[in-house]
């Protein structure tokens, strides 16, 4: 299944692939859903391992969904295991929300802080500001409503 990625995610992921690195892309909502299903089915270790395995893990739209305590714990497990992993272990997290605001979306005492500590230990942080590029090529039209139907050349509109 092909995934739509933001330009920055696609560029980084593509570069990783060009260098022979296994790359996996997932939206934060999909990640939360995978974690919830794993908890229900009792296969959390398998799901966490599958997210630790790729050389590059891209999680898009962090902070667009609320994660309960088990999901937050699993997110930490992924971050922790990737942090300790030998070899390439890049993680790309994209968000329109600053990491200082992520605590509204992750549940748990210091679990998120521990994950962020590991994420930012060796991180390169890119802050991008400015207008969105989405929708720049849109055609826009102005439509004006006519307050009342009028009779034109002897033709009467329906309902009059």
How does the language model describe each region?
Residues 8, 12:
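Hydrophobic positions on the alpha1 helix immediately C-terminal to the Walker A/P-loop
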Residues 13-26:
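Post-Walker A helix-loop "phosphate-sensing" segment adjacent to the P-loop in P-loop NTPases
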């Amino acid at each position: 299944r092909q995934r739509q990625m933001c330009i920055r995610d696609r560029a980084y992921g593509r570069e990783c692939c060009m260098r022979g690195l296994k790359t996996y892309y997932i939206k934060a909502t999909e990640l939360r859903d995978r974690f919830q299903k794993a908890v229900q089915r009792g296969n959390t270790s398998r799901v966490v391992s599958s997210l630790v395995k790729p050389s590059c893990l891209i999680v898009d739209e962090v902070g667009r969904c609320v994660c309960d305590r088990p999901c937050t714990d699993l997110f930490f497990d992924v971050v922790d295991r990737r942090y300790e992993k030998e070899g390439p272990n890049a993680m790309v997290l994209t968000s329109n929300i600053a990491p200082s605001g992520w605590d509204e979306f992750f549940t748990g005492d210091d679990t998120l802080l521990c994950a962020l500590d590991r994420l930012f230990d060796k991180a390169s942080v890119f802050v991008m500001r400015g207008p969105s590029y989405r929708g720049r090529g849109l055609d826009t039209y102005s439509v004006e409503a006519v307050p009342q139907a009028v009779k034109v050349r002897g033709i009467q509109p329906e309902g009059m």
